[in-house]
Amino acid sequence: VIENHSNESHSNERPLGVAAVVLAAGAGERFAGQRHKLLCEVDGVPLVRRAVDAALAAGLDETIVVMGAVDLLGVLPDEVTVLHNEAWQQGQATSLAAAVNYAGSRGHRGVVFGCGDQPGVPTEAWVAIGHADSDLAVAEFNGARRPPVKIGAALWSHLPLSGDEGGRVLLRRRPELVKAIACEGNPDDIDTLEDLKKWNSTTLLR
């Protein structure tokens, strides 16, 4: 279900054919706060908004947010396309599947996906992965491979349709296709209330 759609590339250049996808449908069950973690603030901004703004600023052809467990419309910018994943309880793979199905209908030839709970992934990482000359590219932060991950349309049919593994399945099964790109930033996700408190108490990589 498309909740709203007002996002187009703002660039005057020829379209890249790649959309950014922020996965933000999970329940965040490990987070013991009074609100869903994606609505909690990091540096005065809702966590999911921090991640979405970084993706949107990359200037890819479209920025898509997949939500499910909690309504995020009130904190998202108007420029994004919001998809509601009604099957979110079946795992993150369902959100990625919903995104690539939509991206295919829009004529995109690839998607770059990241997570809504990673506030330290900068726009530059989205740009680098989005422009990678490979159908399977992943950001590498100090040697650790983490989202954003680019998946070309030729590989979409190989993605799982359910479960908590999405792009990781391809990275593991098709290592010969993977292009790892060194990126600056902090790929840590906010899973617990302690993670949030730690992030907000330090100025590291802000």
What are these regions (language model features)?
Residues 2-3, 12-16, 157, 162-206:
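Conserved alpha/beta core of the MobA/IspD/sugar-nucleotide pyrophosphorylase nucleotidyltransferase superfamily
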Residues 14-145, 175-183:
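Nucleotide and nucleotide-moiety/phosphate-recognizing core
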Residues 28, 40, 156-157, 197:
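Nucleotide phosphate-binding site architecture
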Residues 41, 120, 150, 189-190:
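Short aromatic/basic micro-patch
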Residues 144-146, 151, 166, 185:
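A conserved catalytic-core signature of glycosyltransferases
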Residues 146-157, 193:
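Conserved nucleotide-sugar donor-binding
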